[in-house]
Amino acid sequence: MNINLENYYSTRKSVFERIQDASTATKVLMSLLMACLTGIMAQIIIPLPWTPVPVTAQTFAVLCSGLFLGKKYGCLSQILYIVLGVAFIPWFGGMTGGLDVLLGSTGGFLIGFVIASYFIGLITEKYADARNFKKMAAVIGIANFALIYIPGLAGLALWFYLTQGI
């Protein structure tokens, strides 16, 4: 298939519809693969000296999960990422895992991943005209800052209060 400017929009629509029309088993498998991609991207870390929470590339995978898989399966991919990370796969940032990560300084960000993935999937599914680059970049920006950063800061503030009394 040769993609050029003339057939770009029809190709974009075709790919999106193909994912949405896939079988349930295929969508669950894609959710698991997106959870794995999130775990891999979590290993790209930029530590910040003023906070215990580093910047990671996993946010990109989180936002793409809602974009590619839609609200239900994008959200499922992030729930799988969290559940498997808490249960036995050390794939959170810095190859960490376990319940202490979810209940620690990064727990609010992990909860925000589920919310952001659902929101982006909802917008992508509900508003077909939002599937262009400029509109989706705005939606992703809102989801990144409002739906990941705000719950993350709330979780970090709670963690500081409970551990340091600040």
Predicted regions: what they are:
Residues 68-72, 119-127:
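Structural signal for the C-terminal ends of transmembrane alpha-helices
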Residues 72, 106, 134-135:
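Residues that define the loop-to-transmembrane-helix transition and helix capping
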Residues 2-77, 87:
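Hydrophobic transmembrane alpha-helices
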Residues 33-41, 62, 66, 77-85, ...:
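Alpha-helical transmembrane segments in multi-pass membrane proteins
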Residues 127-166:
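Membrane-embedded alpha-helical hairpins and interfacial helices in multi-pass inner-membrane proteins
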Residues 74-78, 101, 137:
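Alpha-helical transmembrane segments and their helix-entry boundary regions
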Residues 43-54, 82-116:
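Interfacial aromatic-anchored transmembrane helix boundaries in multi-pass membrane proteins
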Residues 18, 22, 26, 50, ...:
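Juxtamembrane/transmembrane-helix boundary motifs in multi-pass membrane proteins
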